[in-house]
Design a protein with these regions (language model features):
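Extracellular, disulfide-bonded carbohydrate-recognition/adhesion ectodomains
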Residues: 1-174
Length: 174
């Protein structure tokens, strides 16, 4: 009687394991299909040209706005374009962005001061910095957003902290 009970219990456990295994196989197949689809989508994006007026650099496309907005409105505008305010990851990308601002002098980038730390719009901390001389300086205690600028007097290009409410051009990256 005890043997029969153990056998029944083991059989139930085996059936449950078999059912779980079958479910996991289905999930694995769905994940594999999603992976293949996303990989193809990524490859299509890498090989496709940027939209009109956008410029390709590396794996991303960039655009400088023709209108001026405050930092938050600029970010929302980029999001509406399925992009984000630019996140600068390297010196070569910084040099590319510098080239985008030749005629406008200032543009918002995806950098802001959060709880005393400069962070990118995706929440990552800043690792490399390209601040212009004596920046960030938080003049008047309210410069919590980052911009890329070209100094009209010296021609120096780099980052500057600015009031988030200032209206200026912005650079989106997708």
């Amino acid at each position: 009687d005890q043997l029969q009970s153990n056998y029944s219990s083991l059989k139930r456990s085996k059936d449950q394991l078999q059912s779980s295994y079958t479910s996991l196989l289905r999930v694995k197949e769905q994940l594999h299909q999603s992976y293949n689809s996303l990989t193809a989508e990524r490859d299509d994006f890498k090989n496709s040209p940027c939209q009109t007026d956008w410029r390709r650099f590396g794996d991303s496309c960039y655009i400088v706005s023709t209108v001026k907005k405050n930092w938050e409105s600029s970010r929302q505008n980029c999001i509406a374009w399925r992009a984000e305010l630019v996140i600068i990851n390297s010196l070569i990308e910084q040099e590319f962005v510098n080239g985008l601002i030749d005629s406008i002098l200032y543009a918002w980038i995806g950098l802001s001061l959060k709880e005393g730390t400069w962070k990118w719009v995706d929440g990552t901390p800043v690792t490399s910095t390209y601040w212009t001389k004596n920046q960030p300086n938080n003049a008047n205690g309210d410069q919590d957003c980052g911009e890329v600028l070209q100094s009209a007097s010296s021609g120096e290009k780099g980052w500057n902290d600015e009031r988030c409410s200032a209206d200026q051009h912005f650079i989106c990256e997708q």
